[in-house]
Amino acid sequence: MVVNTEKCIGCGKCTVYCPVRAISVAQRKASIDLDICTECGNCQRAAVCPKDALEKQTLEWPRQIRSQMSDVTTVYRGVNGRGTEEMKTNDITHRFKPGFAGIAVEMGRPQISSSLRDLEKMSRVLAFHGAEFEDLNPITSYIADRKTGTLDPDILDERVISGIVEAAVPIEKLRECVEAVIAASDDIDTVFSLDVISINDEDGGNEARRILDEAGIWYRPNCKNNVGLGHLN
């Protein structure tokens, strides 16, 4: 995003609509810090500029990634949004199978954002511990080597509102993966949420919960549940 300074009157109405605080006003003109801007387009969609001075610029590679990952109206490679439906549609997709656990590392949030370099740190950790990355996740499409989890080096300095690294691991590797992600969190400069996804046993038990409990790893008692209604008409 850029400001057309010939139109801008410096009213500052747009500044509060930037989720990463990239817009500032000085000498009666707004300006956008392009190092921080994630190209989400939120300032323009808010339609608060009385002079229509906020304009989308032509994005070249690798800056295009900012829009692809942060602008909710952008569809890239047939995938829109930060990630998949994860377990919410598992009764239809069968994305997560018995004997496996899903892991999702949700990085960045509005006002904070995340660099692709930090996202790569988590994808490398998961790859090292044998995780298989989700094909339909947009971050996966940027992974240059799935065996190592490394991203295309050209994109590492780009920033996005948020991104999710999605993967699945054999249930017996869950503990080491979770502990490795927690340890790696000391080396990232953003916030993140760690999700664990698993299928209940036939008796209603849950192996993933047992593993986390035995390891003394805290998790929230409330969770998302798939009750299997997706196949009903």
Residue spans for each PLM region:
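Long, contiguous binding/interaction regions
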Residues: 9, 65-99, 124-127, 156, ...
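Flexible loop/N-cap segments at domain edges
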Residues: 159-163
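Cofactor- and metal-binding active-site motifs of prokaryotic enzymes
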Residues: 150-158
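Short beta-strand-to-loop capping motifs
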Residues: 107-109, 166-171
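Flanking helices and flexible, charged tails adjoining ferredoxin-like Fe-S electron-transfer domains
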Residues: 42-137, 143-150
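Iron-sulfur cluster-binding cysteine motifs and their immediate structural context
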Residues: 2-5, 9, 13-34, 38-62
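Short, conserved charged micro-motifs
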Residues: 113-118, 171-180
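Structural signal for hydrophobic packing residues in well-ordered secondary-structure cores
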Residues: 15, 22, 44, 127-130, ...
